[in-house]
């Protein structure tokens, strides 16, 4: 089970969260990664935690002011990237171009989508993984696996029909170990979460609670 913690732009200490994630991953054997702001990738990667970018742009080296170059993210220590999060949506051509950019930089990729139909379309672009996140549940503490489990099973089925090799994750409202188990029972191979860890008073305790049912 893969746990990817998206720090978004929350006012947390990214190194503190990353250190906690690295320790919990080492202690539990569960794969835990952290996706910080682009400027913090290097500092987070130095903790030893698996580090992801929140986004890379569909560009190569050149005149692209304000873009996030995939190669720069990789050089800073990222090993993967999210794409098309509901808070940073992309046009289809830009998703495809960003996947190409990530491939050039040898970054693992997860394309986010809102529902099973979009998951099928995302899987057709051949990322390493897709993640279904209903935007109305993001940050609510109500997990999609409980609010509407058919979204998760539908996403798993939609991806499998198009690309049997793609991993399917779910997100939105994930915050407890019970949520993680529910996602796994519905066929997801991992979860995305953010506020449940990034806004926690004790990120390590939050992560320990999250992975405890897997031990």
UniProtKB/Swiss-Prot annotation:
Source species taxonomy: Archaea, Methanobacteriati, Methanobacteriota, Stenosarchaea group, Halobacteria
InterPro entries referenced in this protein's UniProt entry, alphabetically: Aldolase_TIM, TIM_sf, Triosephosphate_isomerase, Triosephosphate_isomerase_arc, Triosephosphate_isomerase_AS
Keyword 4Fe-4S in record: no
Record localization: Cytoplasm
Annotated metabolic or biological route of this protein: Carbohydrate biosynthesis; gluconeogenesis; Carbohydrate degradation; glycolysis; D-glyceraldehyde 3-phosphate from glycerone phosphate: step 1/1
Keyword line: Cytoplasm, Gluconeogenesis, Glycolysis, Isomerase
Pfam families hit by this protein: TIM
Molecular function, one GO term: triose-phosphate isomerase activity
Enzyme class at the top of the EC tree: isomerase
GO cellular component: cytoplasm
Natural source organism: Haloarcula marismortui (strain ATCC 43049 / DSM 3752 / JCM 8966 / VKM B-1809) (Halobacterium marismortui)
Protein EC: 5.3.1.1
GO BP terms in the entry: gluconeogenesis; glycolytic process
Active site residues of this protein: 85, 133
Record-listed substrate binding positions: 6-8, 138, 173, 194-195
Functional summary from the UniProt entry: Involved in the gluconeogenesis. Catalyzes stereospecifically the conversion of dihydroxyacetone phosphate (DHAP) to D-glyceraldehyde-3-phosphate (G3P).
Catalyzed chemical reaction(s): D-glyceraldehyde 3-phosphate = dihydroxyacetone phosphate
Full protein name: Triosephosphate isomerase
Assembly information from the UniProt record: Homotetramer; dimer of dimers.
Major localization class: cytoplasm
Family that this chain belongs to: Belongs to the triosephosphate isomerase family.
């Amino acid at each position: 089970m893969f746990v990817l913690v998206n720090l978004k732009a929350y006012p947390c200490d990214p190194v503190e969260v990353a250190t906690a994630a690295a320790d919990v991953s080492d202690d539990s054997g569960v794969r835990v990664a952290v996706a910080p702001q682009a400027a913090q990738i290097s500092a987070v990667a130095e903790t030893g935690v698996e580090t992801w970018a929140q986004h890379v742009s569909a560009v190569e080296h050149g005149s692209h002011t304000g873009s996030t170059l995939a190669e720069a993210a990789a050089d800073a220590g990222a090993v993967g990237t999210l794409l098309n999060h509901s808070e940073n949506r992309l046009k289809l051509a830009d998703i495809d171009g960003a996947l190409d950019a990530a491939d050039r930089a040898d970054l693992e990729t997860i394309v986010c989508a809102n529902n099973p139909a979009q998951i099928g379309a995302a899987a057709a672009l051949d990322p390493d993984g897709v993640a279904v996140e209903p935007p109305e549940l993001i940050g609510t503490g109500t997990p999609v696996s409980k609010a509407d489990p058919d979204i998760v099973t539908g996403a798993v089925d939609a991806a499998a029909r198009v690309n049997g090799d793609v991993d399917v994750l779910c997100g939105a409202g994930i915050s407890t170990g019970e949520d993680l188990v529910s996602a796994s029972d519905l066929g997801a191979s991992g979860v995305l979460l953010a506020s449940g860890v990034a806004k926690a008073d004790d990120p390590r305790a939050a992560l320990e609670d999250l992975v405890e049912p897997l031990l």
